[in-house]
Amino acid sequence: MLDKTRLRIAMQKSGRLSEDSQALLARCGIKINLHQQRLIAFAENMPIDILRVRDDDIPGLVMDGVVDLGIIGENVLEEELLTRRAQGDDPRYTLLRRLDFGACRLSLAMPIDAAYDGARGLQDCRIATSYPHLLKRYLDGQGVRFKSCLLNGSVEVAPRAGLADAICDLVSTGATLEANGLREVEVIYRSKACLIQRDGEMPPAKQALIERLMTRIQGVIQARESKYIMLHAPSDRLEEIMALLPGAERPTLLPLAGDKRRVAMHMVSSETLFWETMEQLKALGASSILVLPIEKMME
């Protein structure tokens, strides 16, 4: 039996979100020994239990209050939400935040040699998908009648097998579609991983732990999106240089030994520093420009 005083987090056991979810928790300082076959893991340094389950089970576990938090793709979450509403349920949860991994898109795809002139050309077509409610919502909005062929895997083989005229499936690079003689024709939903919380009041200790975890997740994501920049800058060009480097706060300026005309500038930049920007900095008189990754960050 799980200790209900501990925070319970559901995450994908295996698949495209599993490794990124594990890495996120590790970078948040949560020490978990995840054995490949173990479905429940316990944090060594925090009162947190990890349930490793199928991704399409995670929304239900959160909505039904079995776990406190879940890391899940928005596509799976939205499909479960639409499914429950179609059954007359009123599913509840709280979206804590979108995460910076698991990006994909749910797209319509057709055989490479098939003509496509918009969604209305799919009128009365048979479409294979694992996301029937997301597909229905989109095509209903386009005024398109269609027949759904529900498949829970290998959706891309449906046209060749004569099961469907088109498919609606997740796409990351498009390589799988191409390998099966298909081409992406329309994106109907864009998705990333997200963190969700069950509905209802949390015990104070659990809520405090969730807030600590959210602060750490925010720091991890900010650190990944930011760079620490050090450079030497002419004292009379500081405002121009700072305009090229959007930062979290004003930079730290330090005097340079034996040089009254320049200063050392240290700052966190919240945007990617491209080569073009570095060339612009150099043109303004900056030198010794260093761009460093940030491991952890807390504002």
UniProtKB/Swiss-Prot annotation:
Subunit structure: Equilibrium between an active dimeric form, an inactive hexameric form and higher aggregates. Interconversion between the various forms is largely reversible and is influenced by the natural substrates and inhibitors of the enzyme.
Pathway(s) served: Amino-acid biosynthesis; L-histidine biosynthesis; L-histidine from 5-phospho-alpha-D-ribose 1-diphosphate: step 1/9
Protein name per Swiss-Prot or TrEMBL: ATP phosphoribosyltransferase
Reported cofactor(s): Mg(2+)
Location of this chain's protein in the cell: Cytoplasm
Matching PROSITE patterns: ATP_P_PHORIBOSYLTR
Cross-referenced Gene3D superfamilies: 3.30.70.120, Periplasmic binding protein-like II
Pfam families per record: HisG, HisG_C
